[in-house]
Amino acid sequence: MKKLLSTLLLSLGLAAGLAQASPAAPASGKDFEVMKSPQPVSAPAGKVEVIEFFWYGCPHCYEFEPTIEAWVKKQGNNIDFKRVPVAFRDDFLPHSKLFYAVSALGISEKVTPAIFNAIHKQKNYLLTPQAQADFLATQGVDKKKFMDAYNSFSVQGEVNQSAKLLKDYAIDGVPTVVVQGKYKTGPAYTNSIPGTAQVLDFLVKQVQDKKL
């Protein structure tokens, strides 16, 4: 609950802390956590599975987005990267459906920065499907295609699955990144956005070298 509150309440103190660097040698129990109940990994052979749990409305996820995007590009074929939107409350669900709808249309990577900016810069919170469709239309997305995806059984199934993953991975705050179904980290652990990328580098390398 403490991590959830720190995620949802943006403070100047935490924002300042996020600019600090993480220790050079990441430590278990501080910079990352070994999950008590590791989860199955579905990454292709030779790749390390990395899952980011996030919420479009989370200010820290918005701050973290450029870093995680750059980190994923840097890792390239080393990792199998996935995102899972979380809904700690029912009023978060429209954002989960938004993510899976744009993913179904194959435009998630293209529109995610614009969605974050709309919510956090323009204060257009995109809490209804109509508001989402209207906004995405400004990004060149066909409203009908979006609404069809939003209301589809497949998108609802993805939302239901994300709720299960939230429990299975014991996620209590975002952004949280899980490496290889077992190692959990994020800015709430490292108190640093750049430091989180360093810890992710460490975890991926350790998994690759079979040291973790």
UniProtKB/Swiss-Prot annotation:
CDD domains: DsbA_DsbA. Disulfide bonds join 58-61. It holds the Pfam family DSBA. Keywords: Disulfide bond, Periplasm, Redox-active center, Signal. Belongs to the thioredoxin family. DsbA subfamily. Involved in disulfide-bond formation. Acts by transferring its disulfide bond to other proteins. Involved in the production of protease and alkaline phosphatase, motility, metal resistance, and multi-drug resistance. This is Thiol:disulfide interchange protein DsbA. It comes from Burkholderia cepacia.
